[in-house]
């Protein structure tokens, strides 16, 4: 399995990479939505994208809208953000997110979300 981590925080990218690699994922990273789209359009397929909402250059909402419009419909997308507002959650799900995980979170919550996406066994 391959995962793309899109977050402007190096700390968060490293943290998510560790969690994913423990579960056998191969990971790539991007620091903003535009760089994330560039990675996706490079032709290497990903099974999962973990996307923050608040990033420079292109935010997570714009990235979600673009990647779904560009045909990345099979790839699972999990929003990983500090935004806890219901409007943000609904907006992200409407834009094409498959799951939503609020920071901070623990290992169990992360595993549960991956299982809900069918990417790991419960």
Describe each region flagged by the PLM.
Residues 55:
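Receiver (REC) domain active-site loop signature in two-component systems and cognate sites
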Residues 14-22:
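Charged docking surfaces used in two-component/phosphorelay signaling
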Residues 29-48:
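Acidic, metal-coordinating helix/loop segments flanking the phosphotransfer/catalytic sites
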């Amino acid at each position: 399995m391959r995962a793309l981590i899109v977050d402007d925080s190096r700390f968060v990218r490293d943290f998510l990479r560790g969690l994913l690699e423990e579960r056998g994922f191969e990971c790539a990273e991007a620091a903003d939505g535009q760089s994330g789209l560039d990675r996706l359009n490079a032709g290497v397929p990903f099974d999962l994208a973990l996307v923050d909402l608040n990033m420079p250059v292109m935010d997570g909402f714009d990235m979600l809208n673009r990647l779904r419009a560009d045909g990345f419909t099979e790839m699972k997308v999990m929003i990983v953000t500090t935004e806890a507002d219901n409007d943000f959650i609904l907006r992200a799900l409407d834009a094409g997110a498959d799951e939503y995980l609020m920071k901070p979170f623990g290992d169990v919550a992360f595993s549960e979300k991956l299982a809900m996406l069918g990417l790991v066994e419960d």
